[in-house]
C-alpha cells in the first residue's frame, strides 16, 4: 500500500486500516471493530530524521550525570542512534504481529490489541497502561498470558487479552478529539469489553494510570469484574490527607513526602499547564525523548543504568508512538483531570472485587497494606517482589505474568 503524502502535521495521516471484520469474542454488537495495522508514511520518517539532525542541545551544569535531569552526553548518543540506526519498521512489524482493531466508542476511534487465549476456556483480561507508556509495554507479557504452556506454565491459566491504547494516547488519539479523565476511560473500556467484545465477566490489570482505571472498573462495574490485579497501588498518594497510624505508615509518609518534593515536578506542569508543555514536546523529537527517557530511568530498577533494563529499541518504539501520533499533549490530560476533578480514590470509595497486588521494589510509591485495605476490602494476594520497578510488564514480564495467573486461578469459577 502506498503511503499517503505527509504534510508535516501530526498526527500523521497515514494510518493503514484494513477492511472491517468481526473480532473474537463471545458476542458481537452493531459496534463492529475494524482490523488495523500501523504504517507510518516514509515522509514522516524522513521528517523525523531531519529534525533529529538539527537538534539544538542545551548546556549542562557540571556535576553528577543525570543529577539535574536527562544527561547531555547520554542523550547525544541516543539521538544519534535514533537518527542513524533505529529501525522503526521493525517495531511496526512487531506491533502488527498482534491482532489490532479500532472501534468508534464515545466519540473516538479506540485502538486495541485483542489476542484470544489458547485452550478451551481462556479468561478475558483487560490490561491498561499508563504514562509515559503505551501498548508497547505489554508485548512481552501478552504471550505469557494467552499461551502459558509455551512458557512452561499451566495451559489452563490462559487468558484472552485485550490491551487498549488509552483515549488520548498513541493510536487512540486524533487531533481535536475530546479529552478523557480516568472515570471516562474506565467507562469506555467497560463498553469495549462487554458491549463490543461480548465479555460479560472479565478481569482487569494495570499500573500507573492503569491502576486507577482498574480500580474505577471495580468501583463502577463490580458485577462484571472477576478480579483486579495492580502493580501500583492507587491509594495514599496525597501526603496532605494522610496521618500515620503505624510505624509502617510513618515510614511510607516520609518516603512519599521526599518523592513529592524531588520527583513530582513533571506531574505539576502536566496537571496545570499541559498545553504549554505540549508545544515543545510535539515540535522537538529530542525534547520528547528526553522528557520520557528520564522517567524510564528514574522509575525502573536499573541502578542508574537505563540500558541494563531497556534496550534503545524498546525505548524508541514507545517514544516513536508518541511522536508519530502527536499525542503527547493529550496524554497529559489525566493529570489535569485529576487536579481539577472531585473524584479521587480514597476511603470513601470501597472496592469489593477480589484484588491482588505486586509491590515491586523500585515502584515510585509503595503504600503499606493497611492503607490499601481502607479501599480494597477483599485483597486475596499481596506479593513483595525481589526486583523490578514502575514498568513491570517490560522489566519483569515473567514474574508479573505468574502473579496474574496465581490471582485469577481460583477466581475464574467464582
Question: Where do the model's predicted regions map?
Answer:
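Non-catalytic accessory segments flanking enzyme active sites
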Residues: 44-117, 314, 323, 330-345
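C-terminal subdomain of alpha/beta-hydrolase-fold enzymes, centered on the catalytic histidine
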Residues: 270-414
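Conserved hydrolase catalytic core segment
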Residues: 144, 148-151, 196-247
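Alpha/beta-hydrolase
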Residues: 28-46, 51-52, 56, 226-320
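Short beta-strand element of the alpha/beta-hydrolase
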Residues: 122-130
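Conserved acidic catalytic loop of the alpha/beta-hydrolase fold
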Residues: 183-202
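The serine-hydrolase catalytic nucleophile loop
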Residues: 131-143
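Glycine-rich "HGGG/HGxG" loop immediately N-terminal to the catalytic nucleophile
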Residues: 88-90, 153, 157, 162, ...
Amino acid at each position: 500500500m502506498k503511503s499517503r503524502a505527509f504534510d508535516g502535521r501530526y498526527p500523521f495521516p497515514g494510518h493503514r486500516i484494513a477492511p472491517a471484520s468481526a473480532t473474537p469474542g463471545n458476542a458481537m454488537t452493531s459496534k463492529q471493530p475494524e482490523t488495523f495495522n500501523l504504517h507510518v508514511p516514509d515522509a514522516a520518517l524522513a521528517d523525523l530524521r531531519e529534525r533529529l539532525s538539527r537538534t539544538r542541545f542545551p548546556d549542562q551544569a557540571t556535576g553528577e550525570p543525570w543529577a539535574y535531569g536527562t544527561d547531555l552526553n547520554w542523550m547525544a548518543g541516543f539521538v544519534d542512534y535514533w537518527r542513524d540506526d533505529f529501525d522503526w519498521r521493525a517495531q511496526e512489524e512487531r506491533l502488527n504481529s498482534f491482532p489490532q482493531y479500532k472501534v468508534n466508542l464515545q466519540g473516538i476511534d479506540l485502538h486495541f490489541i485483542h489476542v484470544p487465549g489458547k485452550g478451551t476456556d481462556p479468561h478475558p483480561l483487560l490490561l491498561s497502561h499508563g504514562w509515559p507508556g503505551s501498548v508497547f509495554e505489554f508485548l512481552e507479557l501478552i504471550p505469557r498470558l494467552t499461551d502459558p504452556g509455551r512458557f512452561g506454565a499451566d495451559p489452563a491459566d490462559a487468558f484472552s487479552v485485550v490491551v487498549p491504547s488509552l483515549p488520548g494516547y498513541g493510536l487512540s488519539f486524533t487531533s481535536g478529539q475530546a479529552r478523557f479523565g480516568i472515570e471516562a476511560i474506565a467507562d469506555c473500556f467497560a463498553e469495549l469489553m462487554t458491549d463490543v467484545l461480548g465479555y460479560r465477566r472479565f478481569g482487569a490489570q494495570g499500573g500507573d494510570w492503569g491502576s486507577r482505571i482498574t480500580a474505577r472498573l471495580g468501583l463502577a462495574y463490580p458485577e462484571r469484574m472477576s478480579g483486579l490485579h495492580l502493580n501500583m497501588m492507587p491509594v495514599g498518594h496525597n501526603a496532605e490527607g494522610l496521618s500515620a497510624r503505624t510505624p509502617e505508615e510513618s515510614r511510607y509518609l516520609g518516603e512519599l513526602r521526599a518523592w513529592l518534593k524531588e520527583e513530582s515536578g513533571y506531574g505539576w506542569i502536566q496537571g496545570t499547564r499541559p498545553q504549554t508543555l505540549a508545544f515543545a514536546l510535539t515540535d522537538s523529537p529530542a525534547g520528547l525523548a528526553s522528557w520520557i527517557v528520564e522517567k524510564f530511568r528514574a522509575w525502573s530498577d536499573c541502578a542508574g543504568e537505563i540500558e541494563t533494563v531497556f534496550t534503545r529499541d524498546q525505548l524508541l518504539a514507545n517514544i516513536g508512538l508518541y511522536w508519530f501520533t502527536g499525542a503527547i499533549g493529550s496524554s497529559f490530560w489525566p493529570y489535569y483531570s485529576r487536579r481539577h476533578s472531585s473524584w479521587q480514590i480514597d476511603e470513601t470509595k470501597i472496592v469489593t472485587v477480589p484484588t491482588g497486588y505486586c509491590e515491586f521494589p523500585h515502584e515510585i510509591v509503595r503504600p503499606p497494606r493497611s492503607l490499601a485495605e481502607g479501599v480494597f476490602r477483599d485483597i486475596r494476594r499481596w506479593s513483595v517482589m525481589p526486583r523490578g520497578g514502575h514498568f513491570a510488564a517490560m522489566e519483569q514480564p515473567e514474574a508479573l505474568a505468574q502473579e496474574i495467573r496465581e490471582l485469577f486461578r481460583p477466581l475464574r469459577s467464582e
